[in-house]
Amino acid sequence: SVYMDRLLIPNFEKLLKISTQKAGTQRDLKTDIRDVQDKFKEVLEYDPQRFFVSNKWFFGLDTKGMPIYFGMKNLLHTQITGASGFGKSVLLALLAFQAILKRETTIIFDPKQGGDEWLPNVCHKATQVANTPYFFIDIRVKTAQINLLEGMSTDQIINLLIVGLMLEDRGDAADYYRAKSRKMARFVGKNYQNGMTLKEISETYDEYFRKNEADGFADALQELAEVVSINASGGILLKDVIDQICVIYVAGDWEDPKHIIIQRMLLARIVQIVSERDNTVDTPKQVCVILDELSFQISKIFGDALKVIRDKGLHFILAHQSVKDLTNVPDNMDAQAFAGSVMANCPLKFTYRAVDNETAQYFSDFSGTVLVDDESRSIEQTLSLTDRILPEKQIRQTERNLIDLNMMLTLPPGTGVLFGNGIAQISKICPIQVKKTAEAKTVKGFEQPSIYENSELSASLVFEKLG
């Protein structure tokens, strides 16, 4: 009898639990990480182009297979986070494709050598659909492609050199030499002749810089002079690219310090061009700047621009792996202030699975709380020393995050959470299917034909015919 009691009671209670009908007013419960993945309903693969519309931005399908749209015509600053391999580049490609179709000048910065495997191909395909010019710039290639200083005013050259070479005072002994370097930056700005390259400036004035105790400035310019790609006597004019609606894919380098400096200076130059646009009467054309692996693009001018540049028609799409990346800043910046600025000025956020607790907890808290039921039960012990659960239960109201920590740590690949578009929504992102082409990564030297030939920039695009 004791044996039967110990055997039957546990199994009978399991049967009761399975067959008991829950109360109609019972709320959701707290999650269990061991079975939370079963709650993610599988969304079949789909073609994102079927869901593109002209006045909204498509952000994937929800758990019911319905499209998620951001309803404003102009996209806000957008932040994308997630571990490597979970789909950041897929979402970047999705948003870049839509920006190109919406006739936005689109500039992609990618610190991976040679560029991403698929993103350039998606952007190239989009330019074919929209019939807009496409340019692939590879900073590492020994081909002159662009003149960084072409078309700049004296003040812009001075500011670009100061920001790019981080010559601001920092309150230490080296400020003495930084002041000397800033003086040489002013000299370069005032003596610049249109068409001069950084290499020509370095070769012409190197001796003068060193005589004026600016050896550090001279050495820095010598390093930049070695980067052939930005020392073209002609080439692509960034101002014309922005004014005429083009697409530029900039493949950089995450290892070589001088290439990282060039990437930051190119971004600073774009910010300068957009900042001087007049919005008194006409609304400036939209410019979309995509920064993949944000930590390689962080600079003081970017941090400041993020706060004010939308008024001039520029919106950023930032991608990085965790919130800790935002504190990996150059010496002339405050890490916490920059991280706070990114979080505050990117109202749209999309995060894939987090692999560190800090990122997972941040976005879980960001999703808000919902009311759930917390159940407690009473147990009695029988004469056979078997625990028996009594039928009476107590339920109390408590809270948990809408997207809790367990969900953030177990999101399937290709699935993320969109914040800033109403209540946080789980979204499935599928890639735009394209074929790899050599043209997507073909570098054009400055001797190439005009960038505006054979482009029908005034043609309207019919979104319904896509896909």
Each model region followed by its residue ranges:
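Transmembrane-cytosolic junction motif
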Residues: S1-Q26
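Conserved ATP-driven motor cores of ASCE-family P-loop NTPases powering translocation/secretion/packaging/pilus
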Residues: L306, K312-H315, H320-G422
